[in-house]
Amino acid sequence: MQGKALQDFVIDKIDDLKGQDIIALDVQGKSSITDCMIICTGTSSRHVMSIADHVVQESRAAGLLPLGVEGENSADWIVVDLGDVIVHVMQEESRRLYELEKLWS
């Protein structure tokens, strides 16, 4: 699974756990490491961890192997690397501070 199918899969899994403000950014030509970034907001550190863990578990169940997961210790911003898609699960405060949408659009 890759490209648009992977994007839709990830967005669906984030939506399963009520991730908020889900945005998919096409970063082809802007990033050498991925084609798409999906950014969403969790309401608490536990919610952020749950969303990221759900994406990882469902990806593995679908036969995908996440390349890495970063930020699990802090849980206000967790990054899940699925190759063609990188998922940023952030708390509201971190999302406002780093403004990834502005940086990559």
From Swiss-Prot:
UniProt superkingdom: Bacteria
Protein location: Cytoplasm
Main location: cytoplasm
One Pfam family per UniProt: RsfS
GO CC terms in record: cytosol
Record-level GO BP terms: cytosolic ribosome assembly; negative regulation of ribosome biogenesis; negative regulation of translation
Keywords per UniProt: Cytoplasm, Repressor, Ribosome biogenesis, Translation regulation
GO molecular function: ribosomal large subunit binding
Protein's UniProt keywords contain GTP-binding: no
Gene3D superfamilies: Beta Polymerase, domain 2 (3.30.460.10)
Alphabetized SUPFAM superfamilies for the sequence: Nucleotidyltransferase
InterPro entries: Iojap/RsfS/C7orf30 (IPR004394), NT_sf (IPR043519)
Phenotypic effect of disruption: Cell viability is dramatically reduced in stationary phase, cells have a 10 hour growth block upon transition from rich to poor medium. Protein translation in stationary phase is derepressed.
HAMAP family associated with the record: Iojap_RsfS
Protein family: Belongs to the Iojap/RsfS family.
Protein purpose: Functions as a ribosomal silencing factor. Interacts with ribosomal protein uL14 (rplN), blocking formation of intersubunit bridge B8. Prevents association of the 30S and 50S ribosomal subunits and the formation of functional ribosomes, thus repressing translation.
Subunit structure comment from the entry: Interacts with ribosomal protein uL14 (rplN). In pre-50S ribosomal subunits interacts with uL14 (rplN), bL19 (rplS) and ObgE.
Protein's recorded name: Ribosomal silencing factor RsfS
Source species: Escherichia coli (strain K12)
Gene from which this protein is expressed: rsfS
